[in-house]
Amino acid sequence: MPSRLGHTQRPSPIVALSLWLSFPSSCRGIEVLTSLSDHLVHIHAMRRILYLLFMGTALLSSCRPSSTKQTTETEASTSNIDSLERALSQASDPAVRLSLKRQITDLKMQAVTPEERIRIFEDFLTIAEEDVYGINKRDQDYLDRYNEYRMDEEGNRIEPHDSLKRRDQRYTELGLEVEELGEGAVELVLSQALFTHYISQLPPYYQTYWHLLKDREYITTDGCLTLTWHELGDLIARHEAYTKTYPDHPEIFARLCDGYQDLQLLYLVGTDNTEITDDKGALLPEVRKEWQFYAEAHPESPTAKIVQEALKLKSYTNLRPLRELVSKIQKTSDHPLLVAARAQGGN
């Protein structure tokens, strides 16, 4: 039957089948069979489309729980931080405050990039300092007698009482450790374990910077050098190598430069109780050997230039020429750390 568009309308599959059956077997034509076949193909295609739509919907549904879970976790973390910060605002005990600050810092660092963690970590150090000071002040009587509690009357080390062990355990749980200051004095500081926990989550360039800072802490005690001359030279070399390994971080150069200059001066003139000369004013053999090694191992180093000139001096009884030599190189060298120092007014 012609349609309005001039095309022949296809009968439905059922109608086509009825027509085909109504004809004598000799008259059941190919056209009717073709129409029936086309409709069956059409139905099969529609079923396939519906199947694909169903599977797509199922896949989308399966993705939603993960997204929802992530959103829920983020909201829960934010809620926990808010709750902890409210508790912090009401806490007065420095130990409680330090514990809360650690929990807040841990939660904040979970949801940000390594670069953003640097700011969070440094903020923690700043705000934790006050509470560490508060704990030291509160426990001053105990800390003043810390070593006394661990020695007998003859000065021999003994096992501390269980109550003292429990007290030290509480310090450990807070992220604190006892640090010897010399001459029997001690104080509580943030523990190395705590630093390791946070530093491991930061970018490599910051981790290296941090280790340089820690390694140059307390390199002198009671006027004595706590490192060997070679260890001191190695620390200087590591500072200088940092600028080559991480050239794109001049902001770190600005942080390292002052300490680096102090190391150079220490390397050349020694300390009150770790001198570079013997009683007669002659350069100590171990110092001369170390300077020679450094100049050969790091020929392009500004420190190598200093020691090369220092080795030419005839006398070391007066340290002023050495100090002037160090100052001269520091004012003229193009090494990034010394350039950074001059930019800050260091020279």
Give the positions of each predicted feature:
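Acidic, polar-rich low-complexity tracts and alpha-helical solenoid repeat scaffolds
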Residues: 69-347
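Short, Lys/Arg-enriched N-terminal segments with co-localized hydrophobic residues
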Residues: 32-45
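Bacterial signal peptide processing site
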Residues: 64-66
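C-terminal motif of bacterial Sec signal peptides marking the signal peptidase cleavage site
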Residues: 60-62
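Sec-dependent signal peptide recognition
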Residues: 47-53
